[in-house]
């Protein structure tokens, strides 16, 4: 359980460091008289559809939708690092804000028919809202899950994401017992 808390702290520290790095790069560029626009490619990593919003708040107007695996261009982060501004979208506005936790720096491998995997751990394992996101539920050792996509060390399962190292893939043709 302490390891999960440490992971949450590390993910928050990383988000702050990303924002700090962006600010530092802008300051350095400004002092040299040249400010290059910031751009970063990220990939949508979510179970289903991701809302694109008008501003970096959960209650903000929805202006479009993205799907798992979509490539986005990030050009700004919210002050708290929880949201990213994306451009070049196939939506009416062509831009908007999405939650950072539903993005990945690595390409997302979409799986045609999600393979089954069993949770292998000494205790329960956190299923998170996104990569290194907040815990949304626990799952127990022996639970069989369908893996929808993979990105780096993370596996997307129905209802969230979890570290792939806790999963052992079942042989093709296997299915969960009732």
Predicted stretch roles:
Residues 2-18:
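N-terminal Sec-pathway targeting helices
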Residues 54-71, 76-77, 129-144, 148-150:
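SH3/SH3-like (including bacterial SH3b) beta-barrel domains
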């Amino acid at each position: 359980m302490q390891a999960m808390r440490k992971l949450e702290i590390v993910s928050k520290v990383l988000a702050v460091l990303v924002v700090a790095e962006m600010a530092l790069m802008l300051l350095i560029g400004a002092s040299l008289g040249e400010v290059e626009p910031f751009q970063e490619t990220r990939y949508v990593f979510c179970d289903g559809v991701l809302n694109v919003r008008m501003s970096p708040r959960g209650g903000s107007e929805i202006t479009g939708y993205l799907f798992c695996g979509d490539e986005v261009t990030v050009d700004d982060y919210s002050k708290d690092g929880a949201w990213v501004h994306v451009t070049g979208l196939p939506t009416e506005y062509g831009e908007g804000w999405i939650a950072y936790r539903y993005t990945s720096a690595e390409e997302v491998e979409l799986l045609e028919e999600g393979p089954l995997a069993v949770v292998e751990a000494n205790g329960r394992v956190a299923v998170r809202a996104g990569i290194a996101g907040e815990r949304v539920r626990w799952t127990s050792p022996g639970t069989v899950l369908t893996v929808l996509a993979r990105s780096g060390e993370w596996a997307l399962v129905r209802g969230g994401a979890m570290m792939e190292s806790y999963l052992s893939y079942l042989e093709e043709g296997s299915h969960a017992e009732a």
